[in-house]
Amino acid sequence: MSRLQIQLKLAASRIEILRQKEEALAKQARRNVALGLKSYSPALAKARIEPLIMQDIYIELLELLQVDVEILANRCVVLEKRAFNDSMSFKSSLYHVMAAAPQLQIKELRFVHDFLVKLYGKEFARLSDPDLATNDTAFYQLLYPPIPKDELVEAYRKELIRTYFPNDYPKEANKDIPSSAEADTMLNLESSENREQPTSLKEENTQEDDEKVNGNLANISKRAEPQNNGSTNASSLQSSNYLPTNPTLTHSNKAPSFEELAARLDRLKHL
């Protein structure tokens, strides 16, 4: 194992320790700021939240550098043979390390930077200049983060409230959402009880009622009329109370009225 590879592995371990330390500090800082958000003024809350955002960006930068350093440690043989060129698949990792080494207080990274500059020459040092090496804009935004915008600060504040005060978050997040009754009023919706039935449904209900009445009348007439046998005369049927006593109805071919059918039904009940 060469000296360059040893320094790269030590740099990866140092970055991991530094990242874990920053994560613990950021967690404590977020908790302290979240507990004071209810009493802070908007300007003070913004001033307290901006450092938290910058710290999160720094942690993300350390995570990226840790991966890049481990990749370079596995490709150390190529670097030492001066076989590196722009067509290498790990060139972005080398650019990241060369640009971040002068900005971070990690001596192992500084050693890797100085070693590669001496090995490849002074032209290789231009990779550490963000104005000249513009191959990865997203990385340089992590290395030189801009001032957080107001929208980002407000979103971070809401996230803190949601994390540390979950009972207060729904009230703030859903304050503009109307209730179900208000939504019905806004949409002019009628309840199912007050809603008028369509005309076709009314006609169907009326037709069903008429059919039920006609069916009841037919049943009454069947129960009231006698069974006509050839050997049965009118006198025997009248004596057995199957026919009415009114002689005008005995030989009538007309259909009985509703009152007549009702009278027959009453007589049948008394049998």
Swiss-Prot record:
Residues 226-255 have a biased composition (Polar residues). GO terms for cellular component: cytosol; endosome; Golgi apparatus; mitotic spindle pole body attachment site; nucleus. This is Vacuolar protein sorting-associated protein ist1. Belongs to the IST1 family. The gene is ist1. Pfam families: Ist1 (PF03398). Residues 192-205 have a biased composition (Basic and acidic residues). Signal peptide: none annotated. It comes from the Eukaryota. Involved in a late step in sorting of cargo proteins of the multivesicular body (MVB) for incorporation into intralumenal vesicles. The lumenal sequestrated membrane proteins are targeted into the vacuole after fusion of the endosome with the vacuole. Its main location: cytoplasm. Residues 189-255 are annotated as: Disordered. Transmembrane segments: none annotated. PANTHER family: IST1 FAMILY MEMBER (PTHR12161), IST1 HOMOLOG (PTHR12161:SF5). Keywords: Cytoplasm, Endosome, Golgi apparatus, Nucleus. InterPro entries: Ist1, IST1-like. GO terms for biological process: protein localization; protein transport to vacuole involved in ubiquitin-dependent protein catabolic process via the multivesicular body sorting pathway. It is found in: Cytoplasm; Nucleus; Golgi apparatus; Endosome.
